[in-house]
């Protein structure tokens, strides 16, 4: 009897540098690729039509790539703890290979599933692949987790990397008569404009990586914060989120001399740092890492939250960020920080509201990175910015969108506003508003808060929380 093993794809929708797939091929005579449309994730708190659509289209690409190598991707819908054991029984598989997950839900799911499979005589085997170094292997000298980025990066860089694996030429599937390529379930359309979402699938992701390494990475240190430079960042975040690209391969191919490559690699390390934090401190999904701010008194202002989410705050750089999010399912990282600071500090709304809003729309939405970024900006997380650092949206706009190109693209009401006024259009005279064909307070909102006053309110609230925690 030939040995049969399942290669269960999850957040690793690729064939290149896929340790779990390679291990499956080495361990069994017959390999059955599987993808589960997990009903728990599709309907969870952080569910996103944009992310689900991108995933579905990437699964379609994976199915085609597997078929070219002689294997048929099987697809099931349901809870993994129920459908995977049933599928293993149906196919006669004795092993299930997966890429190790680091998120709390994934870890719980895999523990439960391993027990259920074991009861049926099936072994579940996990391999690395989502990160260059696993979240639990980068530790201090005394074996503790890091809570500060810089020493984490030094320890991360000191670890030896495994070799990058080639994609398999052939995958030994079942006999021809037993092959079955399942239809891919339909999902709701994305809420973002499809034309603004990067092409899904591993092949397109590899093209993006090649283009970035050829044209952009060397200048990254200078361009990464420029909101008006669409080619200033890699736009690989959704590819990392769904494992269309291996982070190890990205780092290996980006290695080299130059500040741009060093800074770019540092962003990959930030992703791994936040996964490390979530692995060791899963409570951060429900509460601030900095316990001193657990009692921070936040505002209850649904109207302000809606204005922020809709890009109607009256601060053009904030509104451009939020409109980019809704229109494209993506936001430039600098714009994410500006919008997050405005919600958490100017509006003094709980950062978890913003965290959830981002996850509803981001095609690249990653639980660890999104939580880490929000807590960093809100000054409640690991290695955060100081609580008294509050972004001034006008100054941020002038610095990172000096000519207003980013604002004009996403806030077209302000397209004719002169550069000197683009980041504070409320200062225009009536005649200037007429010339710019925009009436502040009618066509475009006046600021919903006064930044200097909001800053003082936030400082007082954070200081009071620290005193109360002592």
What are these regions (language model features)?
Residues 122, 143-293, 400-401, 405-470:
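Glycine/tryptophan-enriched, flexible segments
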């Amino acid at each position: 009897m030939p040995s049969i093993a399942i290669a269960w794809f999850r957040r690793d929708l690729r064939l290149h540098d896929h340790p779990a797939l390679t291990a499956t091929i080495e361990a069994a005579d017959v390999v059955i690729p599987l993808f589960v449309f997990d009903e728990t994730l599709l309907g969870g708190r952080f569910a996103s039509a944009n992310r689900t659509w991108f995933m579905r289209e990437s699964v379609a690409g994976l199915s085609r790539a597997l078929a070219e190598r002689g294997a048929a991707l099987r697809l099931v819908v349901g809870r993994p703890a129920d459908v995977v054991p049933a599928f293993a029984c149906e196919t006669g598989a004795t092993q299930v290979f997966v890429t190790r997950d680091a998120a709390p839900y994934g870890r719980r799911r895999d523990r439960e599933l391993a027990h259920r499979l074991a009861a049926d005589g099936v072994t579940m085997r996990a391999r690395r692949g989502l990160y260059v170094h696993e979240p639990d292997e980068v530790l201090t000298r005394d074996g503790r987790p890091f809570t500060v980025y810089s020493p984490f990066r030094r320890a991360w860089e000191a670890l030896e990397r495994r070799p990058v694996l080639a994609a398999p030429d052939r995958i030994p599937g079942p006999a021809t008569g037993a092959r079955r390529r399942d239809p891919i379930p339909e999902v709701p359309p994305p809420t973002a404009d499809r034309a603004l979402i990067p092409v899904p699938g591993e092949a397109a992701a590899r093209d993006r990586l090649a283009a970035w390494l050829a044209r952009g990475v060397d200048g990254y240190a200078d361009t990464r914060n420029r909101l008006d430079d669409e080619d200033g960042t890699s736009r690989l975040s959704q590819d990392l989120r769904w494992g269309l690209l291996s982070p190890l391969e990205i780092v290996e191919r980006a290695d080299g001399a130059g500040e741009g490559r060093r800074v770019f690699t540092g962003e990959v390390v930030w992703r791994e740092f936040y996964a490390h934090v979530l692995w060791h401190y899963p409570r951060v999904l429900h509460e601030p890492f900095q316990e001193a701010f657990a009692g921070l008194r936040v505002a209850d202002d649904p109207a302000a939250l809606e204005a922020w989410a809709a890009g109607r705050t009256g601060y053009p750089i904030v509104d451009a960020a939020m409109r980019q999010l809704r229109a494209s399912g993506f936001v430039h990282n600098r714009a994410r920080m500006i919008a997050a600071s405005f919600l958490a500090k100017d509006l003094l709304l709980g950062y978890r509201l913003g965290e959830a809003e981002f996850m509803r729309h981001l095609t690249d939405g990653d639980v660890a990175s999104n939580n880490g970024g929000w807590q960093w900006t809100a000054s409640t997380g690991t290695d955060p910015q100081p609580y008294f650092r509050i972004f001034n949206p006008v100054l941020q706009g002038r610095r990172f969108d000096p000519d207003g190109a980013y604002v004009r693209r996403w806030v077209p009401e302000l397209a004719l506003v002169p550069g000197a006024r683009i980041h504070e259009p409320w200062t225009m005279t009536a005649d200037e508003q007429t010339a710019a064909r925009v009436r502040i307070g009618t066509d475009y909102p006046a600021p919903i808060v006064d930044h200097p006053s909001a800053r003082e309110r936030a400082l007082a609230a954070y200081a009071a929380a620290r005193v109360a925690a002592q």
